[in-house]
Amino acid sequence: TLVIIMEHSKPVNRLQSAGISLATVPQVRGLPNSQDPKLNSHSKLNCIIACLQAEAAGADEGLMLDPHGFVNTTNACNFFIVRRGAVWTSTGDYCMNGITRRKVIDLCRANGIPVFERNFSLVDTYGADEAFLTGTFGAQTPVASIDGRQIGTGEMGPMTLRLRDLYKDLIKQ
């Protein structure tokens, strides 16, 4: 039996400019030998649980750690931070290698923006100048706060705006 539930939504303009809130959730991204987190064809129960945990915490999305305690992804999107002009994202070992994620990494490299796929901690995240999410639906969505802590100015930062503009130019081609 195959069940497909389609949903059509529009981005909330307020969230696209003002940013969203994240809460670190206890649900982690799974190990590849139990449910490969890089594939979009398995049950998404862990992401659904993370979404419910974020909602219970009063956040828009749940920030998920990998099995080793490093920041990884959210329940629905890939996660990036900006520190001192450099863009950081997870190694990709425990998240979907999303098309928008890959395009943002490629855009950074093509435009001389330092970008790192690395392990990083919640402390690194709390001290970030900016944070944003990538996804097909929201492109580059700014993160205003994580666990009640304001990130940067609490609004879309200059790097997120630059990457959003570069991405829009790319998809126009």
Report the location of each language-model feature:
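Helix-start/capping segments and mature chain N-termini
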Residues: 1-173
